[in-house]
Each structure stands twice: as C-alpha cells, then as structure tokens.
Amino acid sequence: MNAELELLWPLSGLLLLLLLGTTAWLCVQCSRPGVKRNEKIYEQRNQQENEQSVASSQTYSLARPVRTGLQMDAASNKSFERKNKLLFSHLEGPESPRYQNFYKGSRRESDAAYVDPIPTDYYNWGCFQKPPEDNDSNSYENVLICKPSTPESGTEESEDYQNSVSILQWRESKRTMGARTSPSGSPDEEPDYVNGDVATTEKI
C-alpha cells in the first residue's frame, strides 16, 4: 500500500494543479477589463444612435409644415408640369429657345453679347503674304563672304572653297621649300607614314 500511496500523491498533485490553472484562466477571461469595456462602448454607442434617430424623427415631424389639401394639390401639379416640360421639350418648334443663350436657326441678326472670332488671316499671316509681282529679294540664296579670286595654279576645285587663297599660299610655300607638288586629290600628295622604329629593330 505504501507504493500505491506514493504514486497517488504526485498524480493527485498534478490533477489539483490542472484544476487550479483552469479556474484561474476562466477568472482572468471573465474579468478582463478590455472585453467588458468594448461591450460597454458598443452598448453606449447603440443607445446614442437610437436616441439620435428618435430625436431626429421627432424634430422632423415637428418641423414639417402642415399643408392643406389645396396646397398639396398645387405642389404636386407644379412638379408634374416640370416633369412634362423636361420630357417633351424636344417636341417644341425650332424657334423656341431650349437654353438661355442658345438659339436655333441662323445667326444673321446681331447680338450685343456676340463677339466675332479672330479671322483666320491673322493666324495665317495674311497681311505678310508675298506680293503678286516676282520679287525675289526675300528668298534664300548662296552668299559669298569674300570675293572669289582667280586661281594661280589653274585648278578649278579651289574656287569652290572659301579658304582657296590659303590653300594656294600653302602650295606655294611647299614649292619654295623644295617639296614636289602633285596634282590635287592624288594619293601622292602627302608622304606615306613610315614606322622608323620597327625598321631599325629588324636590322639589329
């Protein structure tokens, strides 16, 4: 029996501990201030909304003017006439205005508020058009900046360039220095490039 009692004590202690924990958890859940506070807020809000809706319906019913039968008939007739006017306005003749500033038909009669639009000639520069006579003074043309000089060497290509005088002077300077001149545009006009360092290293 001693062995059985020794086994029952820890088991009963564990069972008691579980029971105590469950009870404490339930107490905490029920007495949580956040849950109760939220429920109270919802209850207060619902009560305020109900009170406001009742108050607004009471004020609406009190503020609503009391109408007699003739006034109600006249008001309903006005709304009926307005609906008919809107529905059947397209059936009216073309002479009657549908809008305040819009008139159907021609606009030949002058209106005090009407302003003529700017003519298209203003935008198309009609006043600056070319005169009918054949005057080419404003047209584009090639303009020579300097007077063309007569080439001394007789080449016709040098006349095409503005710096032809400089080219001729350069050719004359080459002649005076003893360099041979070749016709312009030939491949022998400039000496070929020779890599002198490579040639010297091959001989060594």
Swiss-Prot record:
Residues 1-7 are extracellular. The modification Phosphotyrosine is found at residues 60, 140, 161, 193. The modification Phosphoserine is found at residues 61, 96. Residues 147-204 are annotated as: Disordered. GO terms for biological process: adaptive immune response; B cell activation; B cell receptor signaling pathway; calcium-mediated signaling; intracellular signal transduction; mast cell degranulation. One of its GO terms (molecular function) is SH2 domain binding. Residues 29-204 are cytoplasmic. The chain crosses the membrane at residues 8-28. It is found in: Cell membrane. It holds the Pfam family LAT2. A lipid is attached at residues 27, 30 (S-palmitoyl cysteine). Phosphorylated on tyrosines following cross-linking of BCR in B-cells, high affinity IgG receptor (FCGR1) in myeloid cells, or high affinity IgE receptor (FCER1) in mast cells; which induces the recruitment of GRB2. Keywords: Adaptive immunity, Cell membrane, Immunity, Lipoprotein, Mast cell degranulation, Membrane, Palmitate, Phosphoprotein, Signal-anchor, Transmembrane, Transmembrane helix. One of its GO terms (cellular component) is membrane raft. Disulfide bonds: none annotated. Involved in FCER1 (high affinity immunoglobulin epsilon receptor)-mediated signaling in mast cells. May also be involved in BCR (B-cell antigen receptor)-mediated signaling in B-cells and FCGR1 (high affinity immunoglobulin gamma Fc receptor I)-mediated signaling in myeloid cells. Couples activation of these receptors and their associated kinases with distal intracellular events through the recruitment of GRB2. When phosphorylated, interacts with GRB2. May also interact with SOS1, GAB1 and CBL. This is Linker for activation of T-cells family member 2. It comes from Rattus norvegicus. The gene is Lat2.
